Amino acid sequence: MHERSKPKTTGADQTCLEEEKETRGGLRNGSSSDTGGRERTDRGVSCSRRKNCEGQNLEPIGERDDQSSDDDPLLCDERSTIGRHGNADERPHQELAEGGIRMPGRGWWRGKMGNGVWYDFTRHGRGEDDAEGAENNATQQDADVCSGCKFESPREFRKGHRRCSSSTSGILLDREDGASGVPEVSFKERMEAEKKKLKELDDKIYKLRRRLRKMEYKKMGINREIDKLEDSVQ
């Protein structure tokens, strides 16, 4: 009998398989405490989120150790900047050199923005590190309703999208239920914005024409002076 070739598994799949084995082992040993139940639930959610994001062709970029600090050189290189906001106790967001945002948490998923820029996004779990600051950072509700880790460009700000309140670069979370606080830009408002841009362009053109006219007068005056000098020399 020929042995079937085993399918290739990603790092996320391997982690899920290991967690499932640990869960089964815990059930066989009869560990049914509160803490164990919560851990198993969180692991199940974590694996399902990974599969969901992999289905959207997003790139899993690793798993973070809970004991690692926010300034870990593995997470943030020398060119990156750390922006703090709110209370000093809140974990800072790490702004990557390539223009992305990495939020603290256990799992990161990389999604491509509508403007072609890659951003890293963390789904907040129910661990110790985000038990206190979940409401102040990207809230648990926002993280849960983020459907398939989809991202939109801040320029495509339309109804049904909610801006992540803790994001320093304005990442938009794709919400299926629609956000009450996000008004849809009307046709009239868009027309007014376009008219304003046209008016600004007209003003710039007018100023440039005035400068050009002054330069032409100056050139004519210089030419007259040259003619006078030539006449006097002759």
From Swiss-Prot:
Residues 183-234 form a coiled coil. Interacts with host HSC70. Residues 76-96 have a biased composition (Basic and acidic residues). Its main location: virion. It is found in: Virion; Host cytoplasm; Host nucleus. One of its GO terms (cellular component) is host cell cytoplasm. May play a role in virus replication, from virus entry and uncoating to assembly and budding of the virus particle. Interaction of viral NEP with M1-Hsc70 is thought to promote nuclear export of the viral encapsidated genomes. It comes from the Viruses. Residues 1-103 are annotated as: Disordered. It comes from Infectious salmon anemia virus (isolate Atlantic salmon/Norway/810/9/99) (ISAV). Keywords: Coiled coil, Host cytoplasm, Host nucleus, Virion. This is Matrix protein 1.
